């Protein structure tokens, strides 16, 4: 009998899918249109357009920007669109919504670039532990992308997994 210790995890055919690898490390900022409202309620078009024209949008260079309004004011859609036209040339990504919407869009962008063919008929472990906060959206989107391809999908670490999906025979 051999006393050799065999690492069966290392020699298994599992592919680890680590969502942390798809985390965009860039700065995230919120542009709150509330700062452009009169009495936190009214967007005055003339003043807003003048502000948009004169403001130094370069401060958003390379940043990920969520455009939102933190008050219950009714903001015309064109106002958000106008802001986006000025921020887009400088920012990495611009979305409408809060920081959660921004995080979701960043993960979506990264996941859309993955060559999924590598997961065809493979046993995949979606890594559960991470040094960065990975939104639940990213895990659900990963299942949507991998389920049609993978032989099986598990969650956790290769040494301790929770079965999520197994392709029917």
Where are these regions (language model features)?
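Short glycine-rich or small-residue beta-strand-to-loop segments that form or flank ligand, phosphate
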Residues: 64-70, 95-97, 123-129
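Extended, charge-rich low-complexity interaction segments
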Residues: 116-140
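Short coil/turn connectors at secondary-structure junctions
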Residues: 62-63, 90, 120-122, 150
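Short, non-transmembrane amphipathic alpha-helical segments
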Residues: 82-88, 139-147
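Gly/Ser/Thr-rich loops at beta-strand to alpha-helix junctions
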Residues: 70-77, 129-137, 160-161
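N-terminal, charge-rich interaction modules
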Residues: 1-75, 84, 149-152, 156-157, ...
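A domain-level signal for the structural core that forms small-molecule/cofactor-binding pockets
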Residues: 52-53, 128, 137-138, 145-146
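Long, charge-dense
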Residues: 79-118, 156-161
């Amino acid at each position: 009998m051999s006393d050799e210790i065999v690492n069966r995890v290392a020699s298994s055919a599992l592919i680890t899918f680590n969502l942390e690898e798809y985390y965009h490390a860039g700065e995230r900022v919120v542009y709150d249109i509330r700062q452009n409202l009169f009495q936190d309620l009214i967007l005055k078009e003339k003043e807003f357009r003048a502000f948009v024209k004169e403001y130094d949008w370069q401060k958003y260079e390379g940043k990920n920007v969520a455009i939102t309004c933190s008050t219950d004011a009714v903001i015309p859609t064109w106002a958000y669109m106008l802001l986006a036209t000025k921020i887009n040339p400088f920012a990495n990504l611009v979305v409408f919504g809060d920081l959660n919407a921004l995080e979701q869009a960043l993960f979506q962008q990264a996941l859309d670039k993955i060559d999924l063919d590598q997961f065809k008929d493979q046993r995949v472990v979606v890594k559960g532990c991470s040094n960065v906060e990975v939104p639940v959206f990213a895990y659900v989107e990963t299942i949507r992308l991998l389920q049609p391809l993978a032989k099986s999908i598990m969650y956790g670490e290769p040494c301790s997994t929770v079965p999520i999906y197994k392709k029917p025979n």
